[in-house]
């Protein structure tokens, strides 16, 4: 065909890509949901519903929501990211990964809803943020990071792991969905 693939083949490719994107999003959502359930069941942070500060939770949720909604961006090269990650990381250090996951989900989800993002994009954004904050919070705790954090000289390695894992998981999750949706190799879109 002189203009590339015939229209029916392009539509088949688009439908296949869409199916792959939905499957990828479903896996990320399942991972996020399972991690929240496991963390609240195990309560590794020691911050229990009886000891958590409701006012503190609401403050972190409000700040995360506001920054996410304001779309204040951190730009590095061609990559644009909301600065709301600062709030999510802070909530992980104060409340632990279970509560940080809840704060992150409510903040990102609320902003996606108010911003009228497409449903699949909104669901993915919530889930990938939750997976990133859970993985990074668990890495922090596994390396002996205290909650809430003590003087930084006692928690440098756990804190660095928290940051590196958060950005790595976030980058891999977003790059994965972009690679699938655009039909490009992961290495070409990894940010």
What are these regions (language model features)?
Residues 2-80, 86-191:
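Short helix-perturbing small/polar motifs within transmembrane alpha-helices
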